């Protein structure tokens, strides 16, 4: 792992807890959420987190959450690269994303996401690049969902849950 990985992973749980807390009872199969808010588990604004709930076969119960966090080259702000040393408020660092529904029941909310990335006093400079990064993160999560489903099919849900608890202890 790269030396910065603990920073990315250490606060990911809080990002997932935020999505759960803010969306309990409203999540549906095919939904994907995005956030970068440092108040809700984010590190700095260029580190964007994409979270996908994994439902059971009936689509009624959430079994897992899959998340990916990636550093975007630019998320807006007063300087290119979104890491100004002289910022005074978080908005000067770029577009603040907090619990945004990125994919709704399998449909990328492209126009809404572009509008978000283009918003604020200091919007993203290359929205097409941000959208490509978000698509890659959605695809990474989907691969994680597929692999989790394969593990559950092979080992059973109880065994997978038991090993996940063991890793977290």
Where in the sequence are the language-model features?
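Short alpha-helix boundary/capping segments
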Residues: 4-7, 11, 46, 82-89, ...
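Residues on a specific face of well-ordered alpha-helices
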Residues: 14-17, 52, 64, 95, ...
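Glycine-rich, charged/polar anion/phosphate-binding loops
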Residues: 36-37, 50, 82-84
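Short, Lys/Arg- and Gly-enriched loop/turn segments at beta-strand edges
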Residues: 41-47, 75-76
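A short, hydrophobic, proline-anchored segment that marks a local hinge/packing element in signaling
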Residues: 49-57, 67
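Gly/Pro-rich active-site capping loops and adjacent beta-alpha segments
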Residues: 61-120
């Amino acid at each position: 792992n790269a030396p910065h990985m603990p920073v990315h992973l250490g606060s990911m749980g809080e990002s997932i807890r935020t999505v759960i807390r803010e969306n309990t009872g409203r999540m549906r199969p095919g939904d994907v959420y995005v956030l970068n808010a440092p108040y809700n588990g984010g590190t700095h604004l260029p580190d964007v987190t994409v979270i996908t709930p994994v439902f059971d076969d009936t689509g009624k119960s959430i079994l897992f959450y899959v998340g990916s966090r990636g550093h975007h080259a630019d998320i807006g702000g007063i300087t290119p690269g979104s890491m100004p040393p002289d910022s005074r408020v978080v908005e000067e660092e770029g577009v603040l994303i907090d619990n945004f529904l990125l994919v709704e029941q399998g449909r990328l909310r492209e126009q809404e996401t572009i509008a978000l990335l283009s918003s604020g006093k200091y919007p993203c400079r290359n929205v097409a690049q941000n959208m490509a990064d978000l698509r890659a993160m959605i695809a990474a999560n989907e691969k994680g969902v597929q692999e989790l489903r394969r593990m559950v099919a092979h080992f059973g849900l109880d065994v997978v849950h038991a090993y996940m608890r063991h890793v977290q202890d």
